[in-house]
Swiss-Prot record:
Similarity-based family: Belongs to the alpha-IPM synthase/homocitrate synthase family. LeuA type 1 subfamily.
Xref: HAMAP family: LeuA_type1
Catalysed reactions, semicolon-separated: 3-methyl-2-oxobutanoate + acetyl-CoA + H2O = (2S)-2-isopropylmalate + CoA + H(+)
Transferase recorded as keyword: yes
Protein purpose: Catalyzes the condensation of the acetyl group of acetyl-CoA with 3-methyl-2-oxobutanoate (2-ketoisovalerate) to form 3-carboxy-3-hydroxy-4-methylpentanoate (2-isopropylmalate).
Annotated binding of Mn(2+), by residue: 13, 201, 203, 237
E.C. no: 2.3.3.13
Enzyme class label: transferase
Region spans: Regulatory domain: 390-506
Gene name of this polypeptide: leuA
Protein name from the UniProt record: 2-isopropylmalate synthase
Pfam families: HCS_D2 (PF22617), HMGL-like (PF00682), LeuA_dimer (PF08502)
Length: 506
């Protein structure tokens, strides 16, 4: 049975989702979880896009030990060399070079002839192969490219040294039958087909990204590209967790198995959702809150008698736990550390002390600490340890005529303390006005969302905010048992990003 490799582009294509703005620390958190998931290749970013992207790609490349780290690059020498500088320190570095091959792109975007495109493919792949051990070439807009020219372009790329050939459905235009036949056509029409791994990359504009990816596997693709939760620009990308579980459950049909650790799917989905602020729909396949829920009496009766009557996926397969009590206020440092290691987290002594202190504070107020609480706690503490400002004190009180007053004290990375107060028509508005006064921002609150992480009156709250000032928009999150504290943390998280970004572009 063939093993299907997974290439994750959450950190590159996924981050292009409107409103998503991840900082370096957040990208590294996702990269580490992708490594635990067993992703074969992770596209860490587009190194030539900006200095920030370059540094993020470089840090991920220098950190990840058990996956190939790849940078995107246009078919330009400057892009390729920049990508090399970013990922050369990786255990397994890869270049992903792309060039459009469809008539519409060649005519209106590239202003290049077919001969020019073929020459550019040859030169860029040849250069890439002289620097990188492996090179992936993508024929952008492949599904709207004339098939004979696509085959010709791919043959040029393979002969120049490309190890992986990606056939992207860039605008989500194709359907499963067409995509399957395209892979079969290339199998028959590319003389050097056997010398490369063929990959699929599907967008979801017509809602067929997962189905198209599975059709590509039927057609001979050995690598599937996509994102966690299917995030991405426009309607998103193929959701890797859906493709992986579909291959596993229906291996009788596809004669293929996903080469990832399925039990890490739920944890990866949750992490990506919380860091990006993109909420997973309750009815989403595999990772939605209702994915394993049954309300119909007939369904409930059937499941109670025999679970396979209405459930084709065991929740444990994807790491969906029963969220049982795991630690409490009497748990010691050693038990806490061992449990965090079991969940996949490792940290220095200083990091451990900070997170353990936060855990003890939570345990004093919350009766039962679950795995979901621990993941949220780790997520929050990691974010706050890396940000420019942190809240040291927060006080809110009623003034008059429904007006609230908030006093906020912030401390920056150098230990400087800033304090200010402001009023608002509600507690949250007052808190946000005070933070704005301290940071000297005049931004707009573009989005505010709150969700409970676990059940019960003592559940942790997760608040997501998006701030906008001019053309700049960033997101932030906060985790706390108190809603006002979580809201304040989220605002400081986003405001610190916004302030840094504005200073960077000035």
């Amino acid at each position: 049975m063939k093993q299907i490799l997974f290439m994750d582009t959450t950190l590159r294509d996924g981050e292009q989702s409107p409103g998503v703005n991840l900082n370096e620390q957040e990208k590294l958190q996702i990269a580490r979880q992708l490594e635990r998931l067993g992703i074969h290749v992770m596209e860490a970013g587009f190194a030539a896009a900006s200095e920030g992207d370059f540094q993020s790609v470089k840090r991920i490349a220098n950190t990840i030990q058990n996956a190939t780290v790849m940078s995107l690059a246009r078919a330009k020498e400057s892009d390729i060399r920049r990508a090399y500088e970013a990922v050369k320190g990786a255990v397994s570095p890869r270049l992903h070079v792309f060039l459009a091959t469809s008539d519409i792109h060649m005519k209106y975007k590239l202003c290049m002839s077919k001969e020019d495109v073929l020459d550019s493919i040859h030169r860029s792949v040849t250069l890439g192969k002289s620097l990188f051990p492996t090179v992936q070439f993508s024929a952008e807009d492949a599904t709207r490219t004339a098939r004979d020219f696509l085959a010709e372009a791919i043959e040029v790329a393979i002969r120049a040294g490309a190890n992986v050939i990606n056939i992207p459905d860039t605008v989500g235009y194709t359907n499963p039958e067409e995509y399957y036949s395209l892979f079969k056509y290339l199998q028959e029409s590319v003389p050097s087909y056997e010398k490369a791994i063929f990959s699929c990359h599907c967008h979801d504009d017509l809602g067929m990204a997962v189905a198209n990816s599975l059709a590509a596997v039927e057609g001979g693709a050995l690598q599937v590209e996509g994102t966690i939760n299917g995030i991405g620009e426009r309607a998103g990308n193929a959701a890797l967790e859906e493709v992986a579980v579909a291959l596993h459950i229906r291996k009788d049909f596809y004669k293929a198995e996903p080469s990832i650790t399925l039990k890490e799917i739920k944890a990866t989905s949750t992490l990506v959702s919380r860091l990006t602020g993109m909420v997973v729909p309750k009815n989403k396949a595999i990772v939605g809150a209702n994915a394993f829920a049954h309300e119909s009496g007939i369904h409930q009766d059937g499941v109670l008698k025999e679970v396979t009557t209405y459930e084709i996926i065991e929740p444990a397969l994807v790491g969906e736990s029963q969220n049982l009590f795991v630690l409490g206020k009497h748990s010691g440092r050693h038990a806490f550390t061992e449990k965090m290691k079991e969940l996949g987290y490792e940290f220095t002594n200083d990091e451990r002390d900070a997170v353990f202190e936060a855990f003890k504070k939570l345990a004093d107020r919350k009766k039962e600490i679950t795995e979901e609480d621990l993941r949220a706690l780790m997520l929050g503490e990691a974010a706050f340890a890396a940000q420019q400002y942190n809240i040291t004190q927060l006080q809110v009180h009623f003034v008059s005529n429904s007006t609230q007053c908030a006093t906020v004290v912030l401390k920056d990375e150098e230990g400087n303390v800033f304090e200010d107060a402001a009023t608002g028509s509600g507690s949250i508005e007052a808190i946000y006005n005070a933070i704005q006064r301290i940071l000297g921002l005049e931004c707009e609150l573009a989005d505010y969302r709150i969700q409970s992480i676990t059940q019960g009156q003592d559940a942790l709250a997760h608040v997501h905010v998006e701030l906008k000032e001019g053309a700049h928009q960033v997101s932030g999150f906060g985790v706390a048992q108190d809603v006002l504290e979580a809201s304040a943390r989220a605002y400081v998280h986003a405001a610190g990003k916004l302030k840094s970004f504005i200073q960077l572009v000035k």
